[in-house]
Amino acid sequence: MSYEKYLALYGDKFIQQLELESLAKQEAEEHLRKTLDTIKAEGEAGQGHIASSLIKYTWETCRTNIHALVQQVKENNTRGVKSSWFYLMEDLLTIYTNKEDTLEDLLVLTGHSVIIDCLLMTSKERCKTLSYIAVAIGVALKKEADIEKFYQYEETKGADMKWLKSSMDKAIEQRARSSYKVAYAVNRMHKEGYTGLNWSNQDMNVLGAKIIEMLIAGSDFYTLVDKRIDTKTIKCLEVGEWFAQAWQKQEAKLISNAVKHLPTIIPPRHWSSPYDGGYYGASCLQTQLIRLNVLGGTEAVKTYTSKLAMVDLGNIYATLNAMQDTPFIINKDVLNTLKEIYASGGVLGGVPRTEPFEKLPRLPEDATEEEIKEHKKKAVGIYKQEEARKSKALRCLVALKTAERFAEYDSIYFPWNVDYRGRCYPIPTALSPQGDDIQKSLLLFAKGTPLASNEDTKWLKIHGANLSGNDKISFKERIAWVEANETNIVNSAEDPLGYQWWYEVSQGDYPMEFLAFCFEYKKLLTHIEKCGNAKGFVSTLPLAFDGTCSGLQHFSALLRDEVGGQAVNLIPCDTVQDIYSIVANKVNKLMIKDALEGTEDSFKTNKDGEVMLDKEGKPQVKYGDKTLA
């Protein structure tokens, strides 16, 4: 449909929608620009996407230079007195025996990354001196070599290397900044008795300078210059002209692709092809029918999308378009309550505390080693708490700000797309019908259907009971529970901050959705009091209908399996069935029987009767052997 047709269909709202998308894009660009500046200022730019994409341009020439350096050391082909970098390289070759390719990659990548980190820290001139950068490269190489040597050290002790590497990688990945990653690795190695390589700063300076020399010769990225710092003339590094321009272009490209997806104020554009649908203007960027991030590389995506062109996706389009056409409004009762909770410091209704956790007081100078250890342990705990708090608080605040932004509209909509499995998802993430408890509680349907009788209130009551944690009793009992607590429900709706029964009874799982139910149920009771019955009451509260282990529901339905069907609530039953409890009970019975009557583990044997071993040299247990049960 053309611009003119959309304008004729939606009038001024279409213009407003385009303006909203344009503003959202500007906000996304500004946010990314600040993020990129922060990364550079904190000395983390060398590990990012831009650095990786630029390093590959001169990878081969730099790698060739480093290879020659490694071979020179390996063949001991150096005349006269050897510099200290030579002996450090010998250490590295010993550690990376039979892994020279890995070592050469490490030298190139670490060298470039550290140089870029230092040179783009624009506010710190001392970080650009040759000696500072050289030492930084030496330190980074030592850290990598220490980890590799630590693994070798642990292997000689018979450690489970697969678990060790996995746990180290996971713990390092969980830490945000490189300094925290390094601190963790060093502490972990020290605890296991590994002391590390004995490299001096002087030697690391010389090694780093040699790596810099090789990288300058292999690329136009950096140049050596003399700079006046304080009263001295000092050798410094600067980025070359090509590198500076290339970095700027890459940043500009990233920023131009930045986008923030928000709800729309008119029905989203209907999907008509894998690339046409959802938004109308600036938010169309990075929006497509199918989420293909999981496929990885560009070629895989191209292959997949070319095959999509040959498939009839009419049913997919129709499904998504129907979901997109569903109008919502902001639940202002919930929004106002959440704003009050947030303004008063949080810690209610799933809103995290808004004030930072207090840091520990400094230890006295005469603190014992045990007190220092305990202090560090507590400090780490507080740091983790604070990081989690900030993350939750930010997510909550973004949802509130988005809801405030759209509270004035009489209808809002959510563009949807699907993942590669065909599962449907709303594209906006700050606020959506598939979000967390707070996000869901902030949304009402814009249109409702009047109830025909008192019987129609049944599912509203069941929904309320479910949110309060009473979802395992019969429907009749759930309805009775709601009716017995009508006074509590009304009091909660009238004074949510003063009368916190709604929060206590929801057991912390769905507090805000339960409060949204309280608001709706109070309106229902007011209608009944005024009209004598529920007929004509219009409810717009979304009611949750969740599947029970939906994969097994599909299997049970396809196989006409009555036992499985009952366990996953496909067959009518007075009480809700819990497949997980059913399976757990059966397994527990087998485990008790095995403990009392079972045999020792049986092991797999080959045709010669010898016990087969796994990759770690342990006997392979005969899984599924009936004698075990």
Please describe what each predicted stretch is.
Residues 1-628:
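Non-catalytic nucleic-acid-binding interfaces of large nucleic-acid enzymes and RNP effectors
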